[in-house]
């Protein structure tokens, strides 16, 4: 795991929602994320450590209210944790580099993987493939 900034540094540099989601395993309200409707070509990175997580070509509209992807950039980019909270059985996804909470993965996505990586915008930074512009979720 990468060296992660201290909680004080993160609180100073992140919005309340970004801190809540990435550090406290929170979930942003559905249909509110800044990157939900982003359709530009580029790469979605971890907001905390900037590790690449998802290519825009794997993003799709699942209708669930959070950015959805069917595949990460690599197996190493995501860490999978069994999550039994809230009376449900789910698989939590975290950044494979810094362990920031991203969201959950579900087995109801499109082909070719059949998986839906349901990710909080607040855990992501998008880098535009054409002009390099960065947008924090």
Curated annotation (Swiss-Prot):
One of its GO terms (biological process) is protein repair. Keywords: Metal-binding, Oxidoreductase, Zinc. NCBIfam families: peptide-methionine (R)-S-oxide reductase MsrB. Changing residue 46 to D: Loss of activity. Belongs to the MsrB Met sulfoxide reductase family. Residues 7-129 form the MsrB domain. Its cofactor is Zn(2+). The active site is at 118 (nucleophile). This is Peptide methionine sulfoxide reductase MsrB. It catalyses: L-methionyl-[protein] + [thioredoxin]-disulfide + H2O = L-methionyl-(R)-S-oxide-[protein] + [thioredoxin]-dithiol. It comes from Escherichia coli (strain K12). Zn(2+) binds at residues 46, 49, 95, 98. PANTHER family: METHIONINE SULFOXIDE REDUCTASE, METHIONINE-R-SULFOXIDE REDUCTASE B1. GO terms for cellular component: cytoplasm; cytosol. Binds 1 zinc ion per subunit. The zinc ion is important for the structural integrity of the protein.
